[in-house]
Amino acid sequence: MEIRAPPTSLRLAPPPPASASFRRTALRTSFLNGSVSLRLIQVRQSNVNRFKCNGIRSNLLDRFSRVVKSYANAVLSSFEDPEKILDQAVLEMNDDLTKMRQATAQVLASQKRLENKYKAAEQASDDWYRRAQLALQKGDEDLAREALKRRKSYADNASSLKAQLDQQKGVVENLVSNTRVLESKIAEAKQKKDTLKARAQSAKTSTKVSEMLGNVNTSGALSAFEKMEEKVMAMESQAEALGQLATDDLEGKFALLETSSVDDDLAQMKKEISGSSSKGELPPGRTAVSNSGAARPFRDIEIENELNELRKKANEY
């Protein structure tokens, strides 16, 4: 007997074949004398998802380490001082030069010992050769043979020492050449260091000046200058107006003086006219002065004729 799920029960969607595998197994129970069997579905996760998870995890770790390194480099770069870095670089180069000189001295000492050993071996070889000659002259061939064996041993040792000595000389020449190159580089680095330090100091000064200028409130300063300019212009206008008023006052006073002078002249002329003869001849076109002394305006004949004609026309209308 099998128990099947009703049609309305939930169903699992079939997973992709690349990510998981399914296997159905029958499970027997003691319920109803073991006649009931259940079918279980076992899900096995394939290695594909596991590999994908590992790849994503490693990618995230790489990105995180890259970000941390970038921030660390940025922090270190912000703390780097060009002057101190240059001084430290020169000190390290001097330390390397000292170590190279010490190594050269040690190699030279070893070369000197090899030379002494080589000379001693050659000297011993020559001595045993002379002894072999002496023994042969005395008729002792066995002794001469032993002397030649000793001589050969020292000669072989001298040859070996000669090869080592030649090799040591090459090492010494290489060390001396590298030492001279390093010395020249250090001298050049010191010159560049002074130049770069001066440029770095100039750049720092320029940066500080730029920061100071950037912190200055130029808008407030310009507005203050504009206000002071307006104030100065107002003061100049006020001074100009006061000067103009003072000039007008002086001109008015002089005009009054000139007017009084004209009045005086006119009065003087009236006195002269009144004191003269009342029936004297006047200039043509003017009437005589009355006996009362009141002056009447002079009349022009042409004007009087035109005036009479106008009066006639007015009366006709």
From Swiss-Prot:
Keyword flag Transcription regulation: no
Claim: Transit peptide is one of the keywords in the record: yes
UniProt subcellular location: Plastid, Chloroplast inner membrane; Plastid, Chloroplast thylakoid membrane
Annotated GO biological process: thylakoid membrane organization; vesicle organization
Cellular-component GO terms for this entry: chloroplast inner membrane; chloroplast thylakoid membrane
Alphabetical keyword list: Chloroplast, Coiled coil, Host-virus interaction, Membrane, Plastid, Plastid inner membrane, Thylakoid, Transit peptide
Coiled coil: 92-246
Biased composition annotated in UniProt, kind: Basic and acidic residues: 297-317
Membrane topology: Peripheral membrane protein
Chain spans, region Disordered: 265-317
Family: Belongs to the PspA/Vipp/IM30 family.
Function statement: Required for plastid vesicle formation and thylakoid membrane biogenesis, but not for functional assembly of thylakoid protein complexes.
Assembly notes: Homomultimer. Complex formation involves interaction via the central alpha-helical domain (71-286). (Microbial infection) Interacts with the rice tungro bacilliform virus (RTBV) capsid protein.
PANTHER family reported for this sequence: MEMBRANE-ASSOCIATED PROTEIN VIPP1, CHLOROPLASTIC, PHAGE SHOCK PROTEIN A
Protein name as it appears in the record: Membrane-associated protein VIPP1, chloroplastic
Organism: Oryza sativa subsp. japonica (Rice)
Gene: VIPP1
